[in-house]
Amino acid sequence: MTRTHEVDFVLLRHGQTEWNRQGIIQGQEDAKLDGDGVRQAEALGAALAGGRFGSIDVVASSDLSRASDTAYRVANALNISISTVGLTRELRERHVGVLQGVSRRDVDKTHQQLWRTFRKGSDDDWKGHGGESYNDHWDRAVAWMERTARSHAHGTRIAVVTHGGTLHVLKDRCDVDDPLNRNNHKRGVVHNCSVGVVRITVTHTGCEWRCVKWGDTSHLDEANVGSLPHGHGGDAGGA
């Protein structure tokens, strides 16, 4: 493929919510940041403003409030006007239908077969819970990333605040192009306000993805701010 330009996406998981702490499956329910989540977002913003993960030119986010509130704090730390933060439904968590709002403690009793099928994840088109399939989620998130890469100049670095399940999808997309790198990053361990970097190379025939960094929480450790791993509230629908 003939290279045209590269864009880096600095991928950020939102701060913690009360539902994360309680182990409640969130999906597209609009849970708010709790006190720990605010502290995580502020520590993340400070790390980005200090250049720890390189420069940031643009901030974009899922429109769910746990993500957008994190993004606004990041933008403020970077002296980027919050009015320029691009919010989109395409970066939302996967909609998991009737599983949303159910605690992991209870879900195996209240929705046993649905939960087990969802957890098994063997059918990427399955949406028996009444929400989105894995492929639905993939299509919208990957499309947004590639469209955004095409619309920005070479060398642009975009901070993207999104969700654990969406990050899972984006890591899977990287693994399609870079299978040898697959085992170098634990895609299932993505803590609140962790940092990853994905580089998309736009060519004349498509886009090539590469995972540069994944799930970095060193900035939170140094700020003495704890964080919960994705999956605490229920895998792809729990972030």
Where do the protein language model's features map onto the residues?
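Acidic, low-complexity terminal tails and accessory targeting/binding regions
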Residues: M1-D8, I80, R94-D106, H154-T156, ...
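Phosphate-coordination/substrate-recognition cap region in phosphate-metabolizing enzymes
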Residues: R3-T4, L44-R116, R187-H191, G196
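Beta-strand elements within well-structured catalytic alpha/beta cores of enzymes
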Residues: D8-L12, A60, G86, T156-T162
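Active-site metal-binding loops of divalent metal-dependent hydrolases
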Residues: G15, G164, T217
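Loop-to-helix element that buttresses phosphate recognition and phosphoryl-transfer chemistry
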Residues: Q16-V74, K127-V142
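Glycine-rich phosphate-binding loop signature in dinucleotide/nucleotide-binding domains
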Residues: G51-S55, T148-T156
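Phosphate-handling substructures
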Residues: N76-A143, V212, V225-A239
